[in-house]
Amino acid sequence: MAKQELMNLFLSKEFASGYKLAELVTGPFAQLLVDYSGVVQSTQRPLVILDNACGTGIISEALNRSLDSQTKGHWELTCGDISDSLVQYVNQRIQDEGWPRAKAQLVDAQDTKLPSSHFTHIFAAFECLRILQPGGTVAISNWQLPEWLVIAKSAVEAMPGDLPFPTVKEFLASLNEGWDSEEPTRVKLEQEGFDMVQVATVSQKLSLPKSTLVELIKPMLPVILGRFWTDEQRAKHEKHIPTALQQYLDDKYGASDDVPVEPRVIIATARKPC
């Protein structure tokens, strides 16, 4: 149920505009993923890069910022996502920010239908081995501690009604189990046929306004509640969660509008054997 709710969220027209806010949190990790991938130091030419499940294009933005003009003058950058609204958003971003030799297109991350042995670097997870060139690099990131979930759990538990809410581990397991720890991530990549696997846990200290944090959490609520609440609980209590979130943040942080958070992700890079 949670996976279907997540898919419905990705496909909704409102998702792209709301998801842009998430770059406040995902942006620093996108740059770290690019740094860890080694793409800047790569001697492979031309670079043929896939930003798979690209969202609003935050990884592609980091790539464009990190690589020099000569490299980008000959590269090929494909931004793929299953959401038509996000593809439209990224195509507009490509024009607005002047990304050379870049395009956005509809791509199902789990069945890309893209050509085999084509890309030098892929940023994402599914089906990467087939479409990578021999010697190509995959770089992925997955949440280990999405701190917004901890905040939402505390706020919901303060509401009347003894309402259930998942732990971080329970929620992540309901989506893709095993990608939130270093060793299982390493094992999964090696089992897929990759070598030179490197895995690290990284965190970023951020400060977000209360209202921004509430707006970041709201779009994810249907994904959580669709898995862990009954229809009756949702009908009665879901509409009260934003108010509960604001109340929790006001109680915890007082007059200060800044909320310190330190989300944590697993970053992994691996190579397709030559």
From Swiss-Prot:
Q: Which CDD domains match?
A: AdoMet_MTases
- Where does the record locate the signal sequence feature? none
SUPFAM superfamilies xrefs: S-adenosyl-L-methionine-dependent methyltransferases (SSF53335)
User: What family does this chain come from, according to its entry?
Assistant: Belongs to the class I-like SAM-binding methyltransferase superfamily.
* Pfam families hit by this protein: Methyltransf_25
Induction trigger = Expression is co-regulated with the acetylaranotin gene cluster.
Gene3D superfamilies with a match to the protein in the record: Vaccinia Virus protein VP39 (3.40.50.150)
Q: Which GO terms describe its biological process?
A: methylation
| Gene Ontology molecular-function annotations | methyltransferase activity
Q: What is this protein called?
A: Acetylaranotin bis-thiomethyltransferase
Lineage, top ranks = Eukaryota, Fungi, Dikarya, Ascomycota, Pezizomycotina
Q: What happens when the gene is disrupted?
A: Diminishes greatly the production of the two bis-thiomethylated analogs of acetylaranotin, bisdethiobis(methylthio)-acetylaranotin and bisdethiobis(methylthio)-acetylapoaranotin.
- Which pathway does it serve? Mycotoxin biosynthesis
Miscellaneous comment text of the record: AtaS is located outside of the acetylaranotin gene cluster.
Q: What keywords does the record list, in alphabetical order?
A: Methyltransferase, S-adenosyl-L-methionine, Transferase
The free-text function statement in the UniProt record for this protein reads:
Acetylaranotin bis-thiomethyltransferase involved in the biosynthesis of acetylaranotin derivatives, members of the epipolythiodioxopiperazine (ETP) class of toxins characterized by a disulfide-bridged cyclic dipeptide. The first step of acetylaranotin biosynthesis is performed by the NRPS ataP which produces diketopiperazine cyclo-L-Phe-L-Phe via the condensation of 2 phenylalanines (L-Phe). The ataC domain of ataTC then catalyzes the formation of bishydroxylation of cyclo-L-Phe-L-Phe.
The EC number on file is 2.1.1.-
Which enzyme type, at the first EC level?
transferase
